[in-house]
Structures are given as structure tokens and as C-alpha cells.
């Protein structure tokens, strides 16, 4: 045996026996199984574990039960199966020493060729399936140019007439105009939509592919029909794509593009041609929808009901963000029962107070009164007019003959009828919108009443305050004037004349700068060559010494001026004030005392003045020394 198996290249001679020695031969899993007689069977495990079912009656697979069944198949086998296998082995005994080969033997090269053929066959099938799902590629000829254009093969669940109006108006030439855009249902669309209203989406979408199913899955599948399981999975989260034929679903979604078509009414042929040349074959935003435009012969009419139309460019337009999965994605979703995008936006948008007041849901709710109700109202009006006659309506058209035949009519109103009408109106059920409006009206009414009460209360408070103010007004007028005067004086006093930033400038409030005046006074006392004439500021202020308002400044001792104080400013005006004060003091003393007393007083005054002058000279000398 060792000689029959050639040594493989690159293998050590010491390990050559691995390929021929039976000790190293791998045992089959089949030989490890334990043989069981007829007393034991797989059905015992199935009976032991009862399968649970979901709300649709389908069995729920339990991982533990499946594991036990798999272990049973792995480690046990029946006697009958073993006997059958032994018979088969006995019949098919192959003498490998003579070069015989079993019937089911397949070489590696054959495996590769067979796998290639299978894969090529599968690819051919897939390519055929993909070729089946296509849009209408063979576009007819454009034909003669006309004023009107037809737009086909768009996602009409999201595209509205106002979207087309906004898009095409960008390509209108000067002098042209789009009169209106209308969307009509096609014959194919009407037939399909009528069928879907009764049956729903086509049942072909939910058929299972049982070609490649394994035997295990066939055993675990229930007896439910493919149609029922598909519809159930459609409403289960995460199971919608399991039993849906993706190819049929894609074809259905592409067919929905042909349910409607739009007609663009242009003012002239130049406008329609410009739109056709610029838009045909282009993509609408990033939705994967390509504009497919066709010329419509002039004079062609459309009798179908208009789904929606647009004749004026809408204000505050916002395009819808969407994409058609059937045109660009591998996974396609069923949009048959999808909520319209407009309704979702209306539900999510926050309404203003005005929009709540004028809430209009006509597009989604049926109106309370139809045309038949209007006809009934007209008939009731005509009947009442016939009962009342010409009384109060055609009095100007009466003729003398009519006066002879005139008959008085008595009209009585019974309160019972009015009460009945009230009861009938009360018996009517209130809709949700009416309930919202009623509550909003009550809320607004309560808010207005509250605001009104607050206004009345504030007016009362104002009146009471005004009364109290009027009483105190006479007493407070004098205080207000005093406060104003003191405020003005404080503003002048609080002005900072020593501010470094404002030095050299005139104070706008006081109309002078005291620092500049003092510097100029010092410069005047210097000798001519040391003077800085450009810094000399002329003090043009002349105090009114005869003003009676400043009488106390010159006569009262409380306003005495001490030149030795550091706050003293030796200006021309201040010197005049000092002279005037001393003059008036002297005159006062002369009037009060005799001539002798006056002489002594004058001498004393002169001495005092002399002392003051000496003190000032000493201070000035000391200050000069310090500066040097």
C-alpha cells in the first residue's frame, strides 16, 4: 500500500507513513453514531416539546428544540438506516487496487467546470430577470412642435403641479409664459387604482421563491399559504422583505410612475420648445426622476378629472426632499399605503395663532354640505318665497288690478319649532375640528376678558394715583423748584476742573477753565522774557457786584473769604470781590460808629491787611524755594 501512494513533494520521508498507515486515517462521523432500535424515534422529542405559535398561528422556532433535534441526527441512527447503508455498500464494492472508480466520483477539474457552468447559468438567469425590470426605454419621436407639453414617468406620489410650475418657469424665455400645469390620471393608472382600492397591491408581490429552499425549511414551514404569510409579514417589523418578490415589487413601483401624467400649457411654441430643449432627459433635483417630455397636438382636450393644477407661481415655496428607491436603490419599499408627504408636513408643522383660527382641512376632510345640500337649500328658499308671495319683495311692481285681489296673510311663529331646532342642533355630533375651534374660541374669549379686567384695574389705579398726586401737587411745586436749583448747583460743583484729560480746554458747562486762568495769572507776574505768551488766557469774566442776589456775599460774615486757604483762587474777579467786600464793610462801620471809632477801626484794618500781605509774601517765597 505504501508503494502505491507516491510520496508528495516537499514532505519529510520520516512522515511518509501518515498517508498510508490506517492509524492516521480520519474516521467518518457516521461511524461514531449510536445505533438505536425501533423503540426510540425522533418523534418523541417533537411530542415532548410543544411548539409555540404567534398571533397569526405560525410556529415559533425554538433554538433549544432545534439543537436537540440536530444532536439526535448527529449522534444516533436507526437500525433500518444502518441496514440500508450496509446493503448499498455491499452492492457498490469497488476494488481500488485495480484502478476502479465509484460511480459518484467527480474529479476536481469536473467540479470546477460544473461550478462554472452553474454560476454562468445563474448569472444568465439573473441578467434575464434584471432585463425584465426596465422602464420604457424606447421613447417615441418628438413629433411636431406644439404649445402644450406632456410630462410622464415621474414619482407622482411626491411631485405636484406647483413643483413642475416652479421648475419649468426657470426656462421660460422673455415674452413667454406658462399658463397652467395640470396633472391627470392615465387610463392605466385609473384601472390599477380602481383594482387596488378593492384588492390592495397585487398578490404577485408576496409569492415565495420555493426553488432553492432546503428540505429542513420545508419540514419546519407550516401549512399556511404563501399569500397569507406574505401579507402578514408586510405588517410585521423587519419581516416585510423576507417573503416579497423583489423583482415584482420593483416592477410594481416602476408601474406607479405611469399612474398619472402632467400637461404644461404654454403661451406659444417658443416657450414649449425652450422647456423641451432644456429639461428633457435631465434629472429633477437629486430624486433620480428624469424628465420625459412629449409634445401634445394642439386642440387635444382632456376630459379626466384633474388631480391638482397650478396657474400662479406659489409664494414661500419649499421643494419636497425625496428620492425614488425603485430608480436608484437595490432594496425597494412598497409605497402603496405610504402616508402622503403633505399630510405628514401638516401634522408636524407648528401652526400660528392665525392659522389655527383659519384652519382649513378641506383637502383631507369631507365637507359638511355637498352640492345636493345646496340644491335643497335653494328649493327651500323658493318654497318659502312662494308661500310668502310678493309681500315685502315686489311692492314697487304692484298694479291696480293686484290691489283688488290683494289678500292679507298672517304669519305666526311658534316657539315649539324653535326649541325643536335647538334640540336637533344639540343632537348633532361635534367633529374633532369643531371641538378644537370651539375650545380655541373659549380660550381666546377668556384671555380677552382677563386682559379687559386688567386694563380696567390699571385705569382705576392710575386715577387714584392722579388724585393723590393732584392733592400733593401744590405742596410739591416749591420743593421741585428748590430741587432743580440745587441740582444745577451740584452739577457745577461736581465738575472736575483738575482732570488731566481736560486740562487746557474750556469747561463747556462752566464756560471757563480755572486751571488755565490761574496759569495765565502766574505768567503775567513773571518778567517779559520768561513769559509764555501763548499760554496766557485773558480772563474776560466781570462779576456783577451790584446784583442784589449776591448781597450777602459782601455783607454777611458767613461768606467771609480767607486768602490763606489752599482753595483760594487769586483771579481778577476774586480780587474785585475782595475789594468790594472790604469797601462795604467799611461803609457799614462808618454808618454804625463815630468818626473816632472809624479811625481806630481803619487803623486796625490797615494793620490786619498788612499782616495778611506779609503772610502771603512769606508763603510765596517758601513755595518758590521748594520749586527750585
UniProtKB/Swiss-Prot annotation:
Modified residues (Phosphothreonine): 220, 542
GO BP annotations, alphabetical order: maturation of SSU-rRNA; rRNA processing
Compositional bias segments (type: Low complexity): 104-118
Biased segments, Acidic residues type: 119-135, 492-501
Cross-referenced InterPro entries: Esf1, NUC153, RRM_ESF1
Coiled coil spans: 426-495
Role noted for this protein: Involved in the 18S rRNA synthesis. Required for the early cleavages at sites A0, A1 and A2.
Name of the protein this chain belongs to: Pre-rRNA-processing protein ESF1
